[in-house]
Amino acid sequence: MDFIQKAAQTVLPGPDTSMLVITTVVTTASLYTILNRIIYPRRPSVLQNPLSSHISSLSPEEQSQLLYPPDYFPGARDVPTPYGSIRCYEFGPVSGRKVLLIHGISTSCMTLTHIAHGLVERGCRVLLFDLFGRGYSDGVGDLPHDERLYVSQALCVLASSELAWTGQGEEEGFHLVGYSLGGGIAAHLAATFPSTVKSLILLAPAGMIREENFGIVAKVIFRSGWVPEGIVEIMTRWRLKRPIAESAKRKSKGGPSGPSTPKSHLPGDQAIEATVTSEIADAAVAEAPGPLQRQVLKYVNWQVANHAGFVPAFMSTLRYAPMINQHEAWRKLAKREPKTTCFIFGIGDEIVNDEDYRQDVLPLVGGEENVFWARSVPGGHDFPMAHPDQTLERIWRFWGWDEGVAASWVKT
């Protein structure tokens, strides 16, 4: 019996050892749980926009001082949907030509400020909205931010209007303007509903950016899905907080091009660096960026700090959105009525290269006899903000509103 007791004491740990083992197991399990939640975060289906999480606590005076106040455009409304709330703005003459505008990846629809007001001045009825996870639209935490989600969002916005936007008759339907990522989304919307979209205007559109412009590092980090989402989020937050500094480095190394200088290609991962900041990249290095560009630059940082859905939406957009290899959708644009699709590019744009698009896209959409390939606008990827008058002149020409306007174009 004594032998058995001694054996048991030898095999079984004492009280101190047992406590150490238990503590180690509990600590390890806790650390694993914490790290797992950081590396593989579980997000709610709806990520609240700043209107409910931040803006509601501000006084009217404080709200008026925001970079993007809730009443930035006239006709603001919030549209409830199964995906969350969508902020949109509708203004201009009720009987005017209806124009839906879709903005790019980095900011709210404020990037299209000058274009929207210019259209209204010419008698158009405009409708803008903040893409999910930007501005005052909720973020979507449990779905990929691909063309299906964004086209569905646009349809929800159109359906929310008191006016009829989606008819297919000769005097019905709407005209569509897409900028950068918004151009890639607009191409899918027009390809799916060709008779509803009366004319399609693509401003430096994503969708057919050459895949080789995404370097190996960028592909692995942002698009492959191999890097844990939590780590990508940390890297993305860091990158989005530094657009001015990083773009200034690019300028000191010889890029990007000046406002009227023909664009050059950025190698590999530098191209994705520019794409990451998209609309704001050129504004950051401009010799004298305008008030809107400066405002947009600051607003990106504000979104990182105050919009729970912004960084997740940005990450998902880089991975899933229609930015490259959209050949199937773009081929459908060739079936549109001739000369109802317009392409406008910036001369110094290193992100969406008009020469690449001329080679890769023009054959897909039916050639120059089928589309309106406008003369390039001065400036880089931010040309709708930096050179709105020249951009609008191309639009008037496309619509046939000003036959003599070409003489007033800036020489390029």
Which residue ranges define each predicted feature?
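Active-site loop/oxyanion-hole signature of alpha/beta-hydrolase fold enzymes
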Residues: 77, 131-177, 193
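Conserved loop-alpha-helix segment in the C-terminal half of the alpha/beta-hydrolase fold
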Residues: 331-379, 390
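Gly/Ala-rich beta-loop-alpha elbow adjacent to hydrolase catalytic centers
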Residues: 178-182, 186
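Conserved HGGG/HGGXW glycine-rich cap/lid loop of the alpha/beta-hydrolase fold
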Residues: 80-136
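Catalytic active-site module of serine/aspartate enzymes centered on a nucleophile-bearing elbow/loop
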Residues: 2-18, 367-412
